[in-house]
Amino acid sequence: MDGIIVIYKEKDWTSFDVVAKLRGIFHEKRIGHGGTLDPMAEGVLPVFVGKSARACDMLPCEEKEYVAGFELGMTSDTLDITGKVSEKKQTYFTKNEICDACGKFVGDILQIPPMYSAVKINGKKLYDLAREGKTVEREPRPVTVYEIEVLDFCEKTQTGKMR
């Protein structure tokens, strides 16, 4: 079988878990995906099967869109909800203040990848190194943020979309 399959990746599956499952279903070794989604993320994952796997690196699958809930004033050791809360403080912001702050991140920025991310350094995923208790030097990487939109706002939690 040759072609592109658009899969909805469930939370707690890695992108490689999806590829491994499809390799078993299709009895095909040549399967790749169009961009890593972190294990806690769910969403669309383009998968390239058979001869199409060669096109995987040629197609622009780098642009992603995230919809996420967030709570201001809370920090965890993993920088997401899967980690142990390390700090929690009261914050009081209006929706306009949050929207104005988000606007400062739109455009071309340099981002240091967090230790709990799927970015690879020397062939190892940062989140694997972090789980081993290791921290490595990470170089800032150019990232383009096209838009950030606050979708839902209440005093304690917010939902936003980032592309």
Q: PLM ranges: what are they?
A:
Residues M1-R163:
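Catalytic/RNA-binding core of pseudouridine synthases
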